UniProtKB/Swiss-Prot annotation:
The keyword Cytoplasm appears for this protein: yes
Chief place of localization: cytoplasm
Lineage, highest ranks first: Bacteria, Pseudomonadati, Pseudomonadota, Gammaproteobacteria, Moraxellales
Organism from which the protein derives: Acinetobacter baumannii (strain ATCC 17978 / DSM 105126 / CIP 53.77 / LMG 1025 / NCDC KC755 / 5377)
InterPro entries tied to this protein: KH_dom-like_a/b (IPR015946), RbfA (IPR000238), RbfA_dom_sf (IPR023799)
A single BP term in Gene Ontology: maturation of SSU-rRNA
GO molecular function: ribosomal small subunit binding
Keywords: Cytoplasm, Ribosome biogenesis
Protein name: Ribosome-binding factor A
Subunit (UniProt): Monomer. Binds 30S ribosomal subunits, but not 50S ribosomal subunits or 70S ribosomes.
Keyword Zinc: no
Annotated family: Belongs to the RbfA family.
Amino acid sequence: MAGGQRLKRMADSVQRELSELIRQELKDPRLGGLVTISGVKVSPDLGYADVYVTVMGRELSDDQNEVAHRETLDILNKASGFLRQELSRRIKTRITPRLRFHYDKTNAYGNYMFGLIEKAVQDLPKRESDDEE
């Protein structure tokens, strides 16, 4: 299980350093909102790192939101070479994984489920205090 611990440490390091790099070094004005890295999965050979991101701070309709997320992923994937180079300077390993960015839908799914639960609770018949009689 030592390999699993090594991959977890590497993923944690990549997540921490990439968060800082995106916040401080990436100066693209199209990156509206706060880009948050929600998770990183590193391949066993350290060749690739799948980086899952969410974008906060944009109040858009669902269609605009989809386009904004795609645009953010395009920007990050185009900057992946620069980010990988900077990452290799910060993380002292023999191999620096190639970065692949993906949109993390767990937040959106959680909001969707919360909305369904709220609607179900509102649709429940109101309890009357007839039980006390």
